[in-house]
Regions:
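Conserved structural position within tetratricopeptide repeats
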Residues: 32-33
Length: 61
């Protein structure tokens, strides 16, 4: 199960809720590299980038 996308999304979500945005961003980026079509991942990637004031255009679908 830990290799499943859903599992990784839950882990990233936990870090996001703990306000560890850097760790969360790293995990979402890893998910994006493996699954660029995952809309949940894309949505949170853009959201975190906006919060951190970093460019997010490459993730816009």
């Amino acid at each position: 199960q830990p290799k499943e996308v859903k599992w990784k999304l839950m882990v990233a979500s936990c870090y996001r809720r703990m306000n560890d945005l850097d760790k969360s961003l790293k995990i979402y980026e890893e998910i994006y590299q493996e699954n660029p079509e995952n809309l949940e991942c894309l949505r949170f990637l853009v959201q975190i980038c906006q919060q951190l004031n970093i460019p997010y255009e490459e993730y816009n679908a």
